[in-house]
Amino acid sequence: MAGLKDFQKFLGLLFGLIAFPAIGQVPKIGSDTTLDVGTWNVEWFGDSLNGPSNEVTQLKNVTEVINNMDLDVLGLCEISNPGYWAKLQGNLPQYGAVITTYTQTQKTALMYKKSMFRLLYSKSILLAFDYEFASGRFPLEVALESQWGSKKDTLYFWVIHLKANTGSTSEKLTSYNRREKAAEELKNYLDPKKSWKGMVLGDWNDDLDASIVSGKASPFLTWRSDTNYVFPSYRLSLAKQKSTASYSEMIDHMCVTASLKDNFLSNQSGVMVGDSYIASYRLNTSDHYPVWAKFSMDFKVWVGVESLEPAWRETMGIPCQLLVFDLQGRLLMQGDPETVKPAATGMYLLQYVYPNGARKSVKVYVR
């Protein structure tokens, strides 16, 4: 019987590999030196009638993607089952989360690292524009208070899911007009709030360089031409990257408001192409890929002295090597902790490497 059981176990493993063979590990995007933000439409997440057919596998894969990417803030679209939403939060205890309260099944949500932010409030906005916002998929507004440095700051996030481009030619034109009007109303809402440090995340369901509707300009042209806003995803549109598994356009975007646009690290945005890492990604995870961007923030740990001495004082008597990185993750210098001292004022990430291979990181500000 033991031989039979071993054979059955072998068959189970074999068929498991055939169904969902491993391709590679989802890459880490997050960094200790940057604020890492993303947006992802998780296609009918948890819904038994739509989207991926195996909700358990979808939950597993979505958990893996979020864990491995290690973003600080993530906007989500199409959360469609409260039970699976609760399971996802249980799988990711490092994140706090809020979800919209509108009645549509496909809901928007925001996840944020609890070590970095405290929730101030969340609410749906622009409730007078039900039709424009895909018949009730109102923008989710979330205010988070930063938990780093000597001074607290408030960051605002808006998660949106605009009208999809489906149906006949005339229906697609109608959907285009609804996306354009919804974007206009959201911009009207945000324009007076130039002092707010904010980001708009989500499935915009159209591209930035030109519309996915043949012969039409991007419905977000007024945003793109306004210097008070920057789209980290615009460079991806120009590079002809795509944010879905089935189509060739970028329809998932991130937009940064005036008070935060200078924090975007130029050229540090991208798409996590899911089917490069998860087999049958389109069938068992989502029809969209996560889109991400990196920002330089004031992650200050005030040392209050002219050198980094307090930061390495703890290593006295313990042989180690010190690596010094800038905010973009570039190695600036390395060597003995007592001789490696950045002279320029600024923020640094120090990493101590011990003989046993262990590493410890600390952020310091030199002034």
Where on the chain are the PLM-derived regions?
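N-terminal, active-site-proximal structural segment of metallo-dependent hydrolase catalytic domains
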Residues: 23-94, 102-106, 183-184, 278-281, ...
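Active-site beta-strand/loop signature of hydrolases that rely on acidic residues for catalysis
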Residues: 37-42, 62-85, 111, 142, ...
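Structured beta-strand-rich core segments of catalytic domains in phosphoester-bond hydrolases
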Residues: 73, 79-162
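C-terminal outer-membrane/trafficking sorting elements
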Residues: 304-367
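Metal-dependent phosphoester-hydrolase catalytic domains
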Residues: 25-27, 82, 123, 134-136, ...
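Coil residues (strongly favoring Ser/Thr
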Residues: 33-34, 48, 154, 210, ...
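Bacterial Sec-dependent N-terminal signal peptides
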Residues: 1-26
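Second-shell loop/turn segments in exported
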Residues: 46-53, 71-78, 127-131, 168-177, ...
